[in-house]
Amino acid sequence: MSSKTIELNFLGQVLRLNCPEEQHDSLREAAKLLDSRVTEMKDRTGILQVEKALAIVALNLSFELLQEQHKTHKTENVLQNQIEQLTRSLESISASTPTQQASYSID
């Protein structure tokens, strides 16, 4: 993974960053999301200081990330429990089913 410079327009400024080329599109998307969230925050609340709007948006995004991580963790636990239940069911079925031995004769 070689890093290449990418130019992003963010809050009226040009930022030059290095990141792997295959991540350029994702970084552009992230910058666009952050830019729109900060602009929306400033418009909605009347906050004039970019730093304050950035701090609030960063806090909101961090909160959203934590919420998603908690959801993912709960889903993983549910899936793990279902896998364990299915495994027990299959083991029970396997133990109660008589195995048949195939007999072959070569003429």
Swiss-Prot record:
Chain segments annotated as coiled-coil in the UniProt record: 21-42, 71-96
Location in the cell: Cytoplasm
Alphabetical keyword list: Cell cycle, Cell division, Coiled coil, Cytoplasm, Septation
Pfam families per record: ZapA (PF05164)
Chief subcellular location: cytoplasm
InterPro entries in the record: Cell_div_ZapA-like, Cell_div_ZapA-like_sf, Cell_div_ZapA_N
Gene Ontology cellular component terms for the protein in this record: cell division site; cell septum; cytosol
GO terms of biological process kind: division septum assembly; FtsZ-dependent cytokinesis; septin ring assembly
Family: Belongs to the ZapA family. Type 1 subfamily.
Function: Activator of cell division through the inhibition of FtsZ GTPase activity, therefore promoting FtsZ assembly into bundles of protofilaments necessary for the formation of the division Z ring. It is recruited early at mid-cell but it is not essential for cell division.
Quaternary assembly: Homodimer. Interacts with FtsZ.
Annotated protein name in UniProt: Cell division protein ZapA
Lineage, broadest ranks: Bacteria, Pseudomonadati, Pseudomonadota, Gammaproteobacteria, Pasteurellales
